[in-house]
A protein has these predicted regions:
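Charge-dense, extended regions
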Residues: 78, 87-196, 201-203
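Compact mixed alphabeta submodule
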Residues: 259-306
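Glutamate identity and glutamate-enriched acidic tracts
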Residues: 3, 9, 15-17, 22, ...
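Accessory helical-bundle/CTD segments and flexible terminal tails appended to RecA-like ATPase motors
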Residues: 1-110
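Generic serine detector
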Residues: 4-6, 10-12, 21, 29, ...
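Acidic, glycine-rich low-complexity segments with interspersed aromatic residues
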Residues: 17-20, 24-28, 32-54, 58, ...
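Serine/threonine-rich low-complexity intrinsically disordered regions
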Residues: 6, 16, 29, 64, ...
Length: 306
């Protein structure tokens, strides 16, 4: 399905001839393809706001903060008004880069107070088959979210221990107010007093990061090397090595391999860590200690030599 970009496009390739031709006809509408690809590119969702709002909007004329607060209350113990507004801007493509804007259909318009369906999305919803496909995908997204996260409040940023994430997820989950694709490509990301450290344990031989060695020394302690530009005595380097003094939260994301069978792997969120030892500059070599130690299974997964 990843290669097909949406489930309906996948079906148009694998079903029997009669159904295949039905699906191919549905897939001839470029607006539909750009809309369903946007929705299914979000799966599995890590934040339920956008899908609950879209589900409501499919059968209503508009949605505002007050309505969103009410409908989200069915899915979350605690609803954040800031996250509602961030979700409106996200659906409005305010945080998309030019590539995303050209790839995906804009489904809503946001005037700062309420969101409404775009003419293009409204037109697609007049086709009952398209409407059914949108609703199925959105309902599936909400269902899998509830199975994974329940109604729990994970505070801000909205991160659940031992869940898998990619870098773009983090931009969304900390309400990052700029273009989200700028929030990737480096093993070190930050927003306000949250630092996000993305650690690959097994390096690809010819990658730039191959010279850095990260490893678990015990169930709660591991080595980490900073960005090559960071120093102990200033800026982010100083805040990193003395994170508790500077009230900086270090969020740890780890994956063993960058790719498995040519598929990029996500990172497992291990919660908070604190700096306990450090030396050198550009890069700084650190030992970090997790607040919650790894269980036996994860420790073995991360340290087993293959």
């Amino acid at each position: 399905i990843d290669e097909s970009k949406s489930y309906i496009e996948f079906l148009s390739k694998v079903e029997d001839e009669k159904k295949k031709s039905e699906y191919k006809i549905l897939c001839q509408n470029e607006d539909f393809i750009k809309a369903i690809r946007f929705i299914e590119n979000q799966l599995p969702i890590k934040r339920v706001y956008e899908f609950v709002i879209l589900k409501y909007l499919i059968s209503h004329d508009f949605c505002d903060e007050k309505i969103a607060f009410k409908i989200l209350g069915k899915y979350l113990k605690k609803v954040s008004k800031d996250t509602i507004i961030h979700s409106f801007y996200y659906l409005n493509q305010d945080y998309f880069d030019s590539g995303q804007i050209s790839r995906y259909l804009k489904l809503i318009d946001f005037d700062g107070k309420k969101i409404v369906k775009t003419k293009e999305f409204e037109s697609l919803l007049e086709n009952l088959k398209y409407k059914e496909i949108f609703e199925d995908s959105i309902n599936y997204g909400i269902y899998t979210y509830e199975e994974e996260f329940g109604t729990a409040d994970f505070a801000m940023p909205f991160l659940k221990l031992y869940t898998k994430y990619n870098m773009l997820n983090i931009a969304q989950l900390c309400n990052f107010p700029k273009i989200h694709s700028s929030f990737r490509g480096s093993g070190f990301l930050k927003y306000q007093d949250d630092f996000f450290l993305f650690i690959n344990l097994e390096k690809e031989k010819f990658s730039k990061s191959a010279i850095y060695h990260n490893a678990f020394l015990s169930k709660d302690t591991f080595t980490y090397q900073s960005k090559p530009s960071q120093s102990q005595d200033k800026g982010d380097g100083q805040r990193l090595v003395e994170n508790q003094k500077h009230k900086v939260k270090l969020h740890i994301f780890v994956r063993k391999f960058v790719q498995v069978d040519k598929k990029t792997q996500e990172f497992i969120y291990l919660g908070f860590a604190n700096s306990v030892k450090y030396s050198g500059n550009r890069p700084i070599s650190l030992e970090l200690k997790l607040e919650i130690p790894l269980d036996n299974r994860l420790f073995e997964e991360f340290t087993k030599v293959i």
